[in-house]
């Protein structure tokens, strides 16, 4: 006995909210570097009846019956994950069950070092992730700085990773894991240099490639699999899949690591996996191996570099003065505005982006920059020529933010009053919506 009416009939209130969100996406210039659009096939997997099934354990070792097809789907996902990143099953294994990138990072770290083990990652203000051991002067912000003993390395004043500084910190701290791979670092990563440091202190090299995984799969950036012991990635960013994650582990270099990783995921941190997500990941990984996806990934990079050039041409300051990947960090200090205020202005005119720290920041709550990226816009068909319009709109938003701050004050609560019933906001929003609505949308 159950209700089998379609959502529009069964729950119109919820249906209307979902429709409004869809329309928001259609009418928005999405510059959030960690977002993308899934295709129809992936969305079909997410809504499939396979989500009815409970399947604690691993293929052919389940704690429930009736998992014959679930096993085959998970094995297919496993196979496609290795193929997507061109690594052999003899050398590498992969766990496809983590529910998210944060979960995958915690699970992998726990497997490698255990409670109170020493880890070393990049500071959040420099471009690291919360789960890389972040803490500040007031508290241990992430569970990874509480569960493990953490030290953080930083970028230099130009925004680049200083490998000598990383080495010196590693020699003094003697971590068991060094993490590279970041959330707002616009340059390629020296995995070979990190490997050499890890070997010097007898540490695992952990590469979190959540933001750049497609570039790795398509051989457009340095390859961490040559040097790393563990590689994690989300599947919903530039990979264009569902919100899930993968943990790769080098079992040839580290005998027994497969048992450590797998037992950390289940049963230490998770119970039954989300089978609909695993099916959706498998579906998207099939696309990753196609020439079509490689062309898409190349275009993301072309668009990002073009956007960076457009912004520099308009005299905006960029961290590291450009980008090697899909993301750009804009330094707003010369305009005397915060990323928080610009984010609010952009949100009011249907441009989605996020406030972001720059390397000189000490306050992560009110940062001096924004992070923007090109994956979602590229999925919607944008090319290099379109970056001129986007750069124009960003500059207009910056100048308007400065104007509103001078009129309404520096406090965010006061500043936001200037966004309401503002003809300039309405005019910019109309321009953005008209432009965005003409882009293809899945």
From Swiss-Prot:
**Major subcellular site:** cytoplasm
Query: What is the regulation of this protein's activity?
Result: Redox regulation; active in reducing conditions, inactive in oxidizing conditions. The reduction of the cysteine pairs allows the access binding of the tetrahydrofolate substrate to its binding site. This mechanism appears to be unique to Plasmodium species.
Entry's localization field: Cytoplasm; Mitochondrion matrix; Plastid, Apicoplast; Nucleus
* Name of protein: Serine hydroxymethyltransferase
**How the protein assembles, per its UniProt entry?**
Homodimer.
Provide the effect of residue 292 to E: No effect on catalytic activity
Recorded source organism is Plasmodium falciparum (isolate 3D7)
Q: Result of mutating residue 125 to P?
A: Severe loss of catalytic activity characterized by a severe loss in substrate affinity
Which residues are connected by disulfide bridges in this protein?
Answer: 125-364
Modification type N6-(pyridoxal phosphate)lysine: residues: 237
* Any single Pfam family the record assigns to this protein: SHMT
Q: Does the keyword Cytoplasm apply?
A: yes
HAMAP family cross-referenced by the UniProt entry = SHMT (MF_00051)
């Amino acid at each position: 006995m159950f209700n089998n009416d379609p959502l529009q009939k069964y729950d119109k209130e919820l249906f209307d909210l979902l429709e409004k969100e869809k329309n928001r996406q259609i009418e928005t210039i999405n510059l959030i570097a960690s977002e993308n659009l899934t295709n129809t096939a992936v969305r079909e997997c997410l809504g499939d009846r396979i989500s009815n099934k409970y399947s604690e354990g691993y293929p052919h070792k389940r704690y429930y019956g009736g998992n014959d097809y679930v096993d085959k789907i998970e094995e297919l996902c496993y196979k496609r994950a290795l193929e997507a990143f061109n690594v052999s099953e003899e050398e590498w294994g992969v766990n496809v069950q983590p529910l998210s990138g944060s979960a995958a990072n915690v699970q992998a770290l726990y497997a490698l070092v255990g409670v109170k083990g020493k880890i070393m990652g990049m500071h959040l203000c420099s471009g690291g992730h919360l789960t890389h051991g972040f803490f500040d002067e007031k508290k241990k912000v992430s569970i990874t700085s509480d569960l493990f003993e953490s030290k953080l390395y930083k970028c230099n004043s130009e925004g680049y990773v200083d490998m000598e500084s990383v080495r010196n910190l590693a020699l003094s701290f003697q971590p068991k894991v060094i993490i590279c791979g970041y959330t707002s670092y616009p340059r390629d990563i020296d995995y070979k240099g990190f490997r050499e440091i890890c070997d010097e202190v007898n540490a695992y090299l952990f590469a979190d490639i959540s933001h750049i995984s497609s570039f790795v799969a398509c051989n457009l950036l340095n390859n961490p699999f040559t040097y790393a012991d563990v590689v994690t990635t989300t599947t919903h960013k530039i990979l264009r899949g569902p919100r899930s994650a993968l943990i790769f582990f080098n079992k040839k270099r580290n005998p027994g690591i497969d048992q450590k990783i797998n037992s950390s995921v289940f049963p230490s941190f998770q119970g039954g996996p989300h089978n609909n997500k695993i099916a959706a990941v498998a579906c998207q990984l099939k696309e990753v191996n196609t020439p079509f996806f490689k062309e898409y990934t190349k275009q993301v990079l072309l668009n990002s570099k073009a956007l960076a050039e457009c912004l520099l041409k308009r005299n905006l300051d960029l961290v590291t003065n450009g980008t090697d990947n899909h993301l750009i960090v804009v330094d707003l200090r010369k305009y005397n505005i915060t990323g928080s205020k610009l984010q609010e202005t952009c949100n009011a005119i249907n441009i989605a982006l996020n406030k972001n720290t720059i390397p000189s920041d000490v306050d992560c709550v009110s940062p001096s920059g924004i992070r923007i990226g090109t994956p979602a816009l590229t999925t919607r068909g944008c090319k290099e020529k379109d970056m001129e319009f986007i750069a124009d709109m960003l500059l207009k938003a910056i100048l308007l933010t400065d104007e509103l701050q001078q009129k309404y004050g520096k406090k965010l609560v006061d500043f936001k009053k200037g966004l309401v019933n503002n003809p300039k906001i309405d005019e910019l929003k109309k321009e953005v919506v008209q432009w965005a609505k003409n882009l293809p949308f899945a």
